[in-house]
C-alpha cells in the first residue's frame, strides 16, 4: 500500500513517529490495507528501536476508535496484565477480579485466550461456565447483576484479525502485546495493570494517563510475574492525583507467607478452574494469598480501601464469607441467561 510506505520508511531509519503519524499508520494496519511483509517490517522496526510513548498512544487511539464499546458504571476498574511473562502461572487477575467485584467494586475485565501460559482469562472463565463473546447489552447486565463482566478481546477488537497472521509468523512480542490492555472497551479510568518487563512500567503508566486514566498501579513482580507476586517484592509505578510515584510491595509486611514459584504454576483451564473454585470454597493455598493480595491492590486503586492492609482484610473476608463464590455463581448465571 503506497500511503503506508512513508511511515514504514521513517521507522526503518530509526526515527520515531509522532502521535498522529502512529495513529494513521496503525489505522492502515487495522484496516487490512497493508501487506503482511509491510506489517511485519513495520512492527519489527518499532520493536528493535523500542516503541516511543507517542507511538503507543497513537496506536492505542487507532484501536480504541474501532473497538466495540460497553457501558460501565462509574468507578469500574480493570485488572489486567500484558501476559507474555512465560511463567505458566495460575489465573491470578481473574480470581482477583471476582474477589474485588464481591467487595462492591465493579470490574469490567478485558482479556483473551492464553498468550504465554496454558490458560488465559478467557480459557479459565469458559471452564468455569461463563459464556464468552457477549454483546454490549449482555455485558452491561453482567455488570449490573454480578458486578463483573468479561469482555472477550476477539469480540471487541475484530480489527486485530488483520494483523493476527503477521503476529503468528513473527513469533515474538510486538506493540500489539501491550495495546490490548491499554484499550478497555468499557473505558475504565482505573487499572491494576501487570507488565512482563519492569522497563515498561513507567512508560505505560504515562501512556494510560495520556489516554484518560486517573488511578493506575502498574506492577511487575521480582520473579517476572505480570502480577503482584507473593514469591518476593513487587515494583509498583502508581498514577494518583495526576502524579507518578514508585514503591515496593512486600507480602510479608501484610502478613502473607512467601510462596515458592512452583506454588503459583497453573496447568490447563480445567485444572486452573478447579483450583479457583477451591479457593472460593475456602482452601487456604498460595493461589488464595496471591489473589487476595492483588484484589487488595485493586480495592486501593478503586478507592474502596485506604491501604493494602485494609484491602487484604476486606478481600479475605469476601472469600471467607462466600461473597466471592456468590459473585462467580451470579456471573455464570447472568452470562448464560
Swiss-Prot record:
Q: Which GO terms describe its biological process?
A: L-tryptophan biosynthetic process
Pathway assignment: Amino-acid biosynthesis; L-tryptophan biosynthesis; L-tryptophan from chorismate: step 2/5
**So what EC number does this one have?**
2.4.2.18
Q: Provide the catalytic activity annotation.
A: N-(5-phospho-beta-D-ribosyl)anthranilate + diphosphate = 5-phospho-alpha-D-ribose 1-diphosphate + anthranilate
Residues noted as binding 5-phospho-alpha-D-ribose 1-diphosphate in the record, renumbered to the chain:
81, 84-85, 89, 91-94, 109-117, 121
What is the enzyme's main class?
transferase
GO molecular function per UniProt: anthranilate phosphoribosyltransferase activity; magnesium ion binding
Q: How is the cofactor bound?
A: Binds 2 magnesium ions per monomer.
Q: For anthranilate 1, which residues are the binding ones?
A: 81, 112
> Where Mg(2+) 1 is bound, by residue?
93, 227
* Chain residues that bind Mg(2+) 2: 226-227
Any one Gene Ontology cellular component term annotated for this protein? cytosol
| Cofactor section | Mg(2+)
- Which residues are involved in binding anthranilate 2? 167
State a single Pfam family of this protein.
Glycos_trans_3N
Going by the UniProt record, its keywords in alphabetical order are:
Amino-acid biosynthesis, Aromatic amino acid biosynthesis, Glycosyltransferase, Magnesium, Metal-binding, Transferase, Tryptophan biosynthesis
PANTHER family the record matches: ANTHRANILATE PHOSPHORIBOSYLTRANSFERASE
**What does this gene product do?**
Catalyzes the transfer of the phosphoribosyl group of 5-phosphorylribose-1-pyrophosphate (PRPP) to anthranilate to yield N-(5'-phosphoribosyl)-anthranilate (PRA).
Q: What family does the Swiss-Prot or TrEMBL record give for this protein?
A: Belongs to the anthranilate phosphoribosyltransferase family.
Q: How does it assemble?
A: Homodimer.
Q: What is this protein called?
A: Anthranilate phosphoribosyltransferase
Which species does the entry assign this protein to? Methylobacterium nodulans (strain LMG 21967 / CNCM I-2342 / ORS 2060)
Amino acid at each position: 500500500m503506497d500511503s503506508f510506505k512513508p511511515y514504514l520508511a521513517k521507522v526503518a531509519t530509526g526515527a520515531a513517529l509522532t502521535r498522529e503519524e502512529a495513529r494513521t499508520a496503525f489505522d492502515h494496519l487495522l484496516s487490512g490495507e497493508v501487506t503482511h511483509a509491510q506489517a511485519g517490517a513495520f512492527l519489527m522496526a518499532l520493536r528493535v528501536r523500542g516503541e516511543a510513548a507517542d507511538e503507543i498512544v497513537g496506536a492505542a487511539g487507532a484501536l480504541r476508535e474501532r473497538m466495540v464499546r460497553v457501558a460501565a458504571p462509574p468507578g469500574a476498574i480493570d485488572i489486567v496484565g500484558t501476559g507474555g511473562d512465560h511463567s505458566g502461572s495460575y489465573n491470578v487477575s481473574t480470581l482477583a477480579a471476582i474477589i474485588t467485584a464481591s467487595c462492591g467494586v465493579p470490574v469490567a475485565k478485558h482479556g483473551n485466550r492464553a498468550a504465554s501460559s496454558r490458560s488465559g482469562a478467557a480459557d479459565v472463565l469458559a471452564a468455569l461456565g461463563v459464556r464468552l463473546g457477549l454483546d454490549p447489552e449482555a455485558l452491561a447486565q453482567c455488570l449490573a447483576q454480578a458486578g463483573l463482566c468479561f469482555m472477550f478481546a476477539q469480540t471487541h477488537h475484530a480489527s486485530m484479525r488483520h494483523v493476527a497472521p503477521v503476529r503468528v509468523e513473527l513469533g515474538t512480542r510486538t506493540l500489539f502485546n501491550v495495546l490490548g490492555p491499554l484499550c478497555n472497551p468499557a473505558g475504565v479510568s482505573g487499572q491494576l495493570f501487570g507488565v512482563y518487563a519492569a522497563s515498561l512500567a513507567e512508560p505505560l503508566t504515562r501512556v494510560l494517563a495520556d489516554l484518560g486514566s486517573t488511578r493506575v498501579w502498574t506492577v511487575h513482580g521480582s520473579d517476572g510475574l505480570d502480577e503482584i507476586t507473593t514469591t518476593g517484592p513487587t515494583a509498583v509505578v502508581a498514577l494518583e492525583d495526576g502524579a507518578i510515584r514508585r514503591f515496593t510491595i512486600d507480602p510479608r509486611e501484610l502478613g502473607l507467607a512467601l510462596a515458592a514459584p512452583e506454588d503459583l504454576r497453573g496447568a490447563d483451564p480445567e485444572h486452573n478452574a478447579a483450583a479457583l473454585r477451591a479457593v472460593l470454597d475456602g482452601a487456604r493455598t498460595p493461589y488464595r494469598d496471591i489473589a487476595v493480595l492483588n484484589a487488595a491492590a485493586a480495592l486501593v486503586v478503586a478507592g474502596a480501601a485506604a491501604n493494602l492492609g485494609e484491602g487484604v482484610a476486606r478481600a479475605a473476608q469476601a472469600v471467607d464469607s462466600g461473597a466471592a463464590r456468590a459473585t462467580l455463581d451470579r456471573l455464570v448465571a447472568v452470562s448464560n441467561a
